[in-house]
Amino acid sequence: MFAFFDEDLTVLDFSLFKNVVSIEIGDKSFTYVKTVCIAELPKLESVRIGFHSFFHADEYDGTQTADCHFYAYDCPELKELIIGSDSFVYYSRFVVKNLPSLEEIMIGDSVYCSQCFTYASLELKGEGMEHEVKNRLSKAENTQDWCGLFQEVRTSAD
């Protein structure tokens, strides 16, 4: 069963919900959304997205949906960003910026062959992000999983 299977809903912008503390999206949700924006939420602490969400109808025939983007930025209290397997498969951009409290990003499932953000570049922006990413990847048990996750990994302090 798909939730929010509405062709007219193409942008999901949470920035108006300034008092939200947690965002939880279930499995198989938001089929036609092409842009997800989680931005400027001063109280947000947790984002959890289920498996097979943001999976476009175009993807069923194996074609890439153009210009699909995920943004999470300027949420000073965000501690965790967890995305289930096979979500955002054909998204072309994944940007995480200025999340000073971020402790955990979990994308996909280590047991199941995940296909999250298969066609995206990973952009981590903000003070200290480059250092943190390099340190955490060097300590990862299986860096091969990370290497295949994104087409390109970029970090910067801007």
Predicted regions mapped to residue ranges:
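Acidic/polar low-complexity surface segments
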Residues: 49-69, 109-122
